């Protein structure tokens, strides 16, 4: 599985190249439209796997308001799933609201995990 750091670097590279950006951006927008998570009230970062130590650390660093908003989005999505209905258009997450609120915390936690692994494997010469 790729780390979020490598995904962010790849995305930055693609966006810095006009030709790649013109090809990839419409495909990405179509993917997001067909994925349908916004119509259930979720943001993209809500879909990331949380069962890793890095993600657990990142989620624990979120501000309280963001944790409450995240939990509310999960409850709303579960209710939509149980009732087999999507949210009305005025309640669905709009593209400008779909921010990457968790990515800075993930990048920080990945950096710390990488540093910890380096320090654990350091060899001291005799």
Curated annotation (Swiss-Prot):
A matching Pfam family: UCR_14kD
Keyword terms: Electron transport, Membrane, Mitochondrion, Mitochondrion inner membrane, Respiratory chain, Transport
Membrane topology: Peripheral membrane protein
Protein name (Swiss-Prot/TrEMBL): Cytochrome b-c1 complex subunit 7
Source organism superkingdom: Eukaryota
Biological process terms in GO annotation: mitochondrial electron transport, ubiquinol to cytochrome c; mitochondrial respiratory chain complex III assembly
InterPro entries: QCR7, QCR7_sf
Role: Component of the ubiquinol-cytochrome c oxidoreductase, a multisubunit transmembrane complex that is part of the mitochondrial electron transport chain which drives oxidative phosphorylation.
S-S pairs: none
Phylogenetic lineage: Eukaryota, Fungi, Dikarya, Ascomycota, Saccharomycotina
Similarity remark: Belongs to the UQCRB/QCR7 family.
Cell compartments where the protein resides: Mitochondrion inner membrane
A Gene Ontology term for the protein's cellular component: respiratory chain complex III
Gene3D superfamilies for the chain: Cytochrome b-c1 complex subunit 7 (1.10.1090.10)
Organism: Debaryomyces hansenii (strain ATCC 36239 / CBS 767 / BCRC 21394 / JCM 1990 / NBRC 0083 / IGC 2968) (Yeast)
Subunit structure: Component of the ubiquinol-cytochrome c oxidoreductase (cytochrome b-c1 complex, complex III, CIII), a multisubunit enzyme composed of 3 respiratory subunits cytochrome b, cytochrome c1 and Rieske protein, 2 core protein subunits, and additional low-molecular weight protein subunits. The complex exists as an obligatory dimer and forms supercomplexes (SCs) in the inner mitochondrial membrane with cytochrome c oxidase (complex IV, CIV).
GO molecular function: ubiquinol-cytochrome-c reductase activity
